[in-house]
Amino acid sequence: MKRDILILSALCTCCNLFAEEITVKYLRYAGPYEIKGPFIVDSLDVNSKKFTDAELLKTAIPFNNVRKSNRTLDAATTAGQSKNSSVSLASFYLNSDRYTDGTLQISGPEHYEVYIDNEKQTPANGELKLTLEPRRYEVVIKYLTAPDETNHIPKVTFKTDSKAVVTATTDPEKRYTLSDVFDGTRIRSVSLSPNGKYLLTAYQTTY
């Protein structure tokens, strides 16, 4: 009996040795963008659905705003306060040195959307299961702040049980991978017209 308990304890210890939690300490920030709610005559829309604050997240805000932003905030701070509803963008990059599975945990804002490499994700109870390849991932969090509410920056962590080295940063630099070699748009051929006035360039795009 004691032997079984010792073996089980040793296994649990080994599992904990490989478990890693990466806390996102800094996020690139853009906003807040004040959003005025619609003038509501009826509480229901044409589909008999009641308007909710979450609908304000549908407001289109280009992600390039946060990519070009020079404002970096500590995740432990706030981004001020707005008299009206506002939408903000917070972003960071996840880098993994190998294939690994993990969980991205997000807390803070009540209403938010998560995009990874421009693709919208669907978290469940603030958690998102991810399978990372050895490359860089861009994570953008679009979140809503209610009127006169403190704009709390999202708290984000990534948990994995593997030996992978995963880092979170606001630096857009990335590794040069095989996808950079094979994927993308490249010049295939170039030819000059007989009179020398025109240049015909053929491009090839691979995915």
Q: Which sequence ranges carry the predicted segments?
A:
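Accessory carbohydrate-binding/adhesion or oligomerization-edge regions at the termini
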Residues: 20-76, 138-178
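Blade-terminus and WD-like Trp-Asp/Gly-His loop motifs, strongest in beta-propeller folds
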Residues: 133, 190-198
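A flexible loop/linker signature enriched in serine peptidases of the S9 family
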Residues: 184, 203-207
